[in-house]
Amino acid sequence: MNFAIFAIKFCIVYEKRQSCEAASARMIYLNDRIGDLDVESALPLLSEQRRQEALRYRRDLGRRTCVAAYLLLRQGLQQEYGIEEMPVFSYGEHGKPALVGYPHIHFNLSHCREAVACVLSDCPVGIDVESVGRYNEQVARYTMSDREMELILQAERPEVVFTRLWTMKEAVLKLSGEGLRDNLKDVLTGRYALGSEGEGPVSVPLITTVEAPDGRYVYSVVYGSGGGK
């Protein structure tokens, strides 16, 4: 069975840039039609490890995004590295996954109700995709710095700015393998400081942030040698 039926490349970004000590090849796979996925037909395409993980989700959306993200990774490994047999996952101290037997291949997965995303790179990488919706100001004030809150409150579409900032923070933390932590206000500092250059104040030179053309979701991706500031 051809798994590409279930994991179509809807958006591809490819670039080579001097980011580690050598040029780094990067590929982003994004599927924003996860509602079209036939989960039951796709389950046999998963490794036993991932299938059991998917089946632990009781809700359809969780199971669907788990399956879709895995299929994107599988497709990317086949097309970019010629890997036909899916490697086993190992997990770091904070739960960041890695591919057993392929230390030179770095990847990261993310999903929301609108889309799933997978990024592959020769360097450590972090990606986060989030749906754009009404934001909770109380949550924003707890997770955003004073400057970030100012940008949100001044924006014509504050929910989009909040989502951009949130995905940036998550991508940086996923790059380092930390995951979410108590203090999120100081994530975008140092080398990830906002607006030091680039397209505007809600941008970071080392982080690529993209809003879907239809405005349903935003994703951010960051590459580095280890995620330190």
Q: Model-derived features: where do they sit?
A:
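Core catalytic alpha/beta fold that binds nucleotide/phospho-ligands
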Residues: 5-229
